[in-house]
Amino acid sequence: MDEPKHITILNTFTVENIPDLDVAVLGALELFSKEPVPTIDLKTVYKKPLIVGSGNAEATGRIIFQDVDAIFASESNFEEKLKHIYAIDGVVVVSASGGKHAPIIVKTAKKYGKHVTLITNSTYSSASKELDHAHSYDEYVFPKNREPYTYNTSTYMGMILGSTGEDPGIIYNFIKEHIATISFPDFLQYNKFYLIIPSKFSGIIRMLHVKFIELFGRQIARDIETFEYVKHATTVVPSDELFISFGDTNDSWGKPENRLHIPLPPDAGYAAMMAIGYFTIAQIQKQHPPYFKERIVAYTKEVSGIFEHDILPIVE
């Protein structure tokens, strides 16, 4: 692996020179190549946990606990699950910041008599203050990099690595050797993209959708489906869009000139899929107008009022 130059960029940028998403990806892989991540093991703690998160935290929870007999929920419906599913014997809250909805979820879970585990990147968070802190499994705190608000790349990637055990150095080298060297098309020709991913990574779909929403809003249209689901009437109405396939080659969808293939490592896990997916989206970000960079400062001021506490455009 190269010297950790991307971490240096992340440690020094300002709102005047916000880096693209690929810097956060490579910086995260640099971080986890030198700092170990906790191993999440709650199989002996809970028999039927409720896994709760907001946005990409919810998606991360689904990935981490995909092989567990668990119930999944967001901030919008978790209390309904607690009310009606009596088999739930504990609540796992996934939250990078441990703020916003997280402390509300913890308080509500305890109101229903459920033990709570917090998976986070922030020590001494508002949610952490609500925990029992009587067991080693009450809180898992993962390392993270300094990043633009909402990028949440090192945060959730670390949690996924703590579950999959993938080697971040191998992922980093694969990106540098096999992805960064691709002659990417002129993405500015397209404002519609269709990402096709291997079926075994269906859990990443929500994370990629959210990243498109955060970076481009409704300025760029996107669909993201698996190789199996794309067969189900998703292209009835044709469009001048770029089809980007990950792993397998797309020989069926879109005009041949509107297809881009992105390779994956042969033994890729969810962390590799996340890193390569985000890195690819960053190439689109580089070529389109800087929608995110121009709006993030104003947005954090607006949303601070909604959550009634300061949310900054740079997460230290």
Q: Where are the predicted features?
A:
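Flexible, glycine/charged-enriched surface loops at secondary-structure junctions
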Residues: I170-I171, Q219-D223, H288-V297
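YjeF_N-associated NAD(P)HX repair module
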Residues: L10-E16, L21, N152-Y190, F292
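Anionic-ligand anchoring segments at beta-strand to alpha-helix junctions in alpha/beta enzyme folds, i.e.
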Residues: S33-I88, F187-H232
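Internal helical hairpin/lid segments
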Residues: S202-I284
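Glycine-rich phosphate-binding loops that contact phosphosugars or nucleotide phosphates
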Residues: T44-N173, F246-P263
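Charge-biased C-terminal accessory regions appended to nucleic-acid-, cytoskeletal NTPase
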Residues: P263-E316
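Cofactor-/ligand-binding subdomain signature composed of acidic, glycine-rich
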Residues: M1-P36, T150-T153
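Short, mixed-charge aromatic SLiMs
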Residues: I175-S183, Y229-S239, I296-V315
